Every structure is written in structure tokens, then in C-alpha cells.
Amino acid sequence: MNFKYIVAVSFLIASAYARSVQNDEQSLSQRDVLEEESLREIRGIGGALLSAGKSALKGLAKGLAEHFASGKRTAEDHEVMKRLEAVMRDLDSLDYPEEATERETRGFNQEEIANLFTKKEKRILGPVLGLVGNALGGLLKNLG
């Protein structure tokens, strides 16, 4: 009788353990699905914010470029215009990196290409925003 009892208890323990392992696997897979869904939502929100920010910066840069293109330009205005064009290229390269690289390298010699990529590595969002802020400040100063 003791042997039957030990076998029955062992069988119950084994089946309970198997059920708990199966439940753990199901809860882990459900957790993974939920985490993946939340990551997709976060990426979607981040992508939407980035897209809105890029669109706003592109619109602002185009407006400033049109303003500088319509009137007489000083050397300083010409430099600001060149920087705005560089900002526009950088923003386009965020959307289509392969096409932007191809477009940027057309018509340049090798030294200019090397300088372009060296400069591009040094560029970060802070200086771009500083440039746009300075351009807006100069524009408001000229208008005011």
C-alpha cells in the first residue's frame, strides 16, 4: 500500500508540476505579446512625434529659405541660406537615407565628399535647432 501511495503522490506532483510549467509558458508568451504590442505603440507614437517635428522643421526651413531667396542677400544671408539647405538635406536623409546620400554625392569631388561626411558626423540636433533659432531671431530682427 505504501508503494501505491508513493506512486500516486508522485504522479500528482508530476502532473501539477507539468501544469505549472505549461501555465508559466503561457503567461510568459502572453507577457511577451503584451510587451511587443506596447513597444509597437511606443514606436508608433515616437515615429509620429518625429515625423511631426521633421515636418515642422522642414516647413520652417522652407519658409526661411523662401524669405532669403526673394530679396537681396548679404554674405551673412548667403551663409544662413547654405546652412538651411544643409538642414533640409539632413531632414530628408532621415526619411530616405539611401537616396539622400546618393543625392548629396552627385557632382562633388572626392575631397568634398570626405568633408561632407566629416561635417555630417559632427552635426547633431542641438546645432540644427540653434541655427534655426538664430535664423528666426535674425528674421524677426530684420522684420522688426
Curated annotation (Swiss-Prot):
Tissue specificity as recorded in UniProt: Expressed by the skin glands.
Pfam annotation, one family: Bombinin
Major localization class: secreted
PTM-bearing positions, type Leucine amide: L143
Positions of the propeptide removed during maturation: 19-43, 74-123
Source organism superkingdom: Eukaryota
Keywords recorded for this protein, A-Z: Amidation, Amphibian defense peptide, Antibiotic, Antimicrobial, Cleavage on pair of basic residues, Cytolysis, Fungicide, Hemolysis, Secreted, Signal
Location within or outside the cell: Secreted
Modified residues (Serine amide): S70
GO annotation, cellular component aspect: extracellular region
Segment forming the signal sequence: 1-18
InterPro entries noted in UniProt: Bombinin
BP term (GO), one: defense response to fungus
Task performed by this protein: Maximin-10 shows antimicrobial activity against bacteria and against the fungus C.albicans. It has little hemolytic activity. Maximin-H15 shows antimicrobial activity against bacteria and against the fungus C.albicans. Shows strong hemolytic activity.
Family: Belongs to the bombinin family.
Protein name per its UniProtKB record: Maximins 10/H15
